[in-house]
């Protein structure tokens, strides 16, 4: 048991999907896992362990933002021995070539957060995905026929910004989308020598506000991302 997770040792698999929304974790467990058992309800941050195609995997919500995912991911790694973590979440497109319901695989994550700078104030430490996971996820997505973009994302501490034009400049530099967690997850993976990847479904297009999705759609309909995440988790077994 850790401070924020009530599971016992052995309750959590060494491979886990991390949606931000705990209800998306519940949806994944109920619709993709067999014999799923809930291992955490603390703060309603639901976590489940079951099997997917005969492989033991877990799924747990992380909440919104880098402070929240940093708490849960660290405890999963340090207290429960998780070795592979894949974030499955949503993002807003800023690259004009990226559209709603398409996928982004976060090759690297820029950030405006001070979480990493707190440790490295003199320079910028690059947050990068595990290449093996990235490569597997890309080929699985291609085989499934899912439109998928690979590139950098911005992990932002700010959801409602007063200067959106600054973010849009990044789109012109090839940054695919804005989200709020990947940089912190990648930094934790680097610290603890584990594997991490961010897979995001585009839920909003900041270049075209008419492209959007409902809260219910974000919770339950992004199944391609969920399947790709699960298939990537078990690809090494």
Swiss-Prot record:
Similarity comment: Belongs to the PNP/UDP phosphorylase family.
Classification via InterPro entries: DeoD-type, Nucleoside_phosphorylase_CS, Nucleoside_phosphorylase_d, Nucleoside_phosphorylase_sf
Pfam families: PNP_UDP_1
E.C. no: 2.4.2.1
GO BP field: purine nucleoside catabolic process
GO function term, MF aspect, one: purine-nucleoside phosphorylase activity
Catalytic activity as recorded in UniProt: a purine D-ribonucleoside + phosphate = a purine nucleobase + alpha-D-ribose 1-phosphate; a purine 2'-deoxy-D-ribonucleoside + phosphate = a purine nucleobase + 2-deoxy-alpha-D-ribose 1-phosphate
SUPFAM superfamilies: Purine and uridine phosphorylases
Binding residue positions for phosphate: 20, 24, 43, 87-90
Function: Catalyzes the reversible phosphorolytic breakdown of the N-glycosidic bond in the beta-(deoxy)ribonucleoside molecules, with the formation of the corresponding free purine bases and pentose-1-phosphate.
Record PROSITE patterns: PNP_UDP_1 (PS01232)
Residues reported in the UniProt entry to bind a purine D-ribonucleoside: 4, 179-181, 203-204
Organism listed in the record: Streptococcus pyogenes serotype M4 (strain MGAS10750)
Summary of subunit composition and partner proteins: Homohexamer; trimer of homodimers.
Transferase found in the keyword field: yes
Site residues by UniProt (Important for catalytic activity): 218
PANTHER family: FI09636P-RELATED (PTHR43691:SF11), URIDINE PHOSPHORYLASE (PTHR43691)
Gene responsible for this protein: deoD
Active site: 204
The entry's keywords: Glycosyltransferase, Transferase
Protein name stated in the entry: Purine nucleoside phosphorylase DeoD-type
A GO term from the CC aspect: cytosol
């Amino acid at each position: 048991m850790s401070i924020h997770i009530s599971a016992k040792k052995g309750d959590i698999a060494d491979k886990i999907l991390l949606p931000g929304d705990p209800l998306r974790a519940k949806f994944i467990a109920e619709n993709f896992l067999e014999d799923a058992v809930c291992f955490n309800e603390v703060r309603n941050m639901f976590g489940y362990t079951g099997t997917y195609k005969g492989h033991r995997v877990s799924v747990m919500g992380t909440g919104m933002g880098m402070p929240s995912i940093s708490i849960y991911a660290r405890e999963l790694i340090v207290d429960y021995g998780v070795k592979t973590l894949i974030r499955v979440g949503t993002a807003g497109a800023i690259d004009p070539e990226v559209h709603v319901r398409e996928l982004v695989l976060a090759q690297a994550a820029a950030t405006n957060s001070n979480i990493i700078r707190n440790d490295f104030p003199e320079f910028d430490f690059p947050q990068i995905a595990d290449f093996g996971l990235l490569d597997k996820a890309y080929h699985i997505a291609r085989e499934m026929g899912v439109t998928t973009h690979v590139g950098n994302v911005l992990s932002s501490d700010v959801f409602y910004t007063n200067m959106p034009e600054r973010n849009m400049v990044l789109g012109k530099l090839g940054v695919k989308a804005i989200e709020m967690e990947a940089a912190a997850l990648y930094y934790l993976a680097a610290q603890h020598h584990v594997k991490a990847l961010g897979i995001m479904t585009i839920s909003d297009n900041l270049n075209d506000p008419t492209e959007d999705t409902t809260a219910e759609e974000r919770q339950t309909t992004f199944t391609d991302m969920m399947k790709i995440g699960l298939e990537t988790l078990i690809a090494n077994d």
